[in-house]
Amino acid sequence: MIIYVIIAFVAILIGMAISVSAFGTGGKRKKIFQDIYFSVEDVDGIGVLYTKTGEYSAILKMENPVQKYSANIDSYYEFNHLVTALAQTLGEGYAIHKQDVFVRKQFHDESNDNHEFLSESYFKYFNGRSYTDSKTYLIITQENKKSRIFSFDSKKWRDFVVKIRKVKDQLKDSGVEASYLDGNTAREYVDRYFSMNFNDKVVSMTNFKVDEESICMGNKRCKVYSLVDVDCVSTPSIVRPFTNIEVNNVSMPVDMVSLVDSIPSADVVVYNQMFFIPNQKRELSLLDKKKNRHASMPNPSNQIAVEDIKKVQDVIARENKQLVYAHFNLVVGVPIDADIQKCTNHLENSFGRLGIHISKRAYNQLELFVNSFPGNCYSTNPEYDRFLTLSDAAACLMYKERIQHSEETPLKIYYTDRQGVPVAIDISGKEGKNKITDNSNFFCLGPSGSGKSFHMNSVVRQMWEQNTDVVMVDTGNSYEGLCEYVGGKYISYTDEHPITMNPFAIKREELNIEKIGFLKNLVMLIWKGTQGEVTKTEDRLIEQVITEYFDEYFMKKQIENLSFNTFYEYSKVRIPQIIKENNLAG
């Protein structure tokens, strides 16, 4: 009996050993998130992430430079040039990891202002409407090539600090708004990525579960889609940074991967775009060896490979292009009860139309998710997660567009964007953060029935609510009701009561060279007409009369009031005197 018990006990132990050997104890998976970061520290206001594998990283929050639906083809190419320039600046041993985050939100008026009735009704109409918001982060990571991660290299650290500052300056010079996250903000961003929660003020993580198809966390389910299957790369032979869509039978350029911001059922989407910059000489040498290996075994497929490698080598030699290893993936989050297969079908169909067939073998869901943490991109497997390409070709697969946000301006005029939610625009061009002009006058022109009055009534009402003085000139009495509503002054021209003006009625502080010049030109126009010629003597004469006229009023108090009539009476007396005093002829 004792022998049977011993045999049974040994069998259980052997079974447990086999189970642990095959499947692990669960501890490794449980601690996988604890093994990413060593610390996050502030260095001169920049939050630097230190991974346990010895990499340094800094996170830039930026705005993509291409306005969505701007139809500006040049701006897409300019972004490509910018990305390749950043890669050239960083050089060997660095990685560029760009994360574009798209979040479904419900619109709520957050201005906390006491609106007038019409504005209150306006915002109430849009309250709760769904829209997609986007944010962009650029993570610069320095690779640690040594096995001993605790050996500090001051030279590499200085190089990292210099390079990240160069990147920010380069973005700024290209007109891209960018700023580094500090330590606390960087920690918060990492936590938000971990929980895939970029919406709530407070984030938490509950009930984390992973299988081959998806990752469940709390009340949402996420799936990671790898864009390129390294074992069977299926991408177009020629790519460009934009694609065309048809709008009213007219082609319009949009981002090549613009589909990532409109995935059905998705509450949150993170598009990870990673560039790894290798040693160029070594990669060219490996390419040459690969070409020779294919050439040594003559068959059609090897011959095609040889020709492709030759083309790449020619482009690199002729145009000084840079080789990079790239990885792209999408982390798509949906409600726990939603069918994530709809997202899969949408992505497969949409990318298929672009000639890109996304990987169907992304069974390493947890690995892809963890490797996409900010600063952890070097954990991606070089064998099956990265593919070699040219930097400008890889940049074509980056997301380049920005969704319209409200401008930072004290004068907010609200319009609805293409998603149907209000955004604040500074139409004056001079009050906002980005100054465009110092002249806020504008002209509204359109055919009858095109909506001029409807538009301008809305604009003027919003300006009035923000204590802005508005002077309007209009034909048709379209704004009489608005003027009465806000208690304005309405001046209307009729034959019986024409509009009059008194340009001479000014205050002492308003009298300057510009004002005298204006009045001189006005007098000359009345005197000579539009086609008349004015001599230098006449010009000086009228200028002197105007100057003395105002001196008589402001200084000597000899004129009762300022008007064209009193100026005319003064001129009739004074002009002959000046002519006589200076012996002027003509």
Task: Please provide the spans of the model-predicted regions.
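Extended, folded cores of ATP/NTP-driven motor/assembly subunits in large transport
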Residues: I2-E401
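Beta-sheet entry/capping signal
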Residues: S57-I59, G93-A95, K135-Y137, H327-N329, ...
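Switch/coupling segment of Walker-type NTPase motor domains
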Residues: P65-A71, I96-F102, Q106-N112, S119-E120, ...
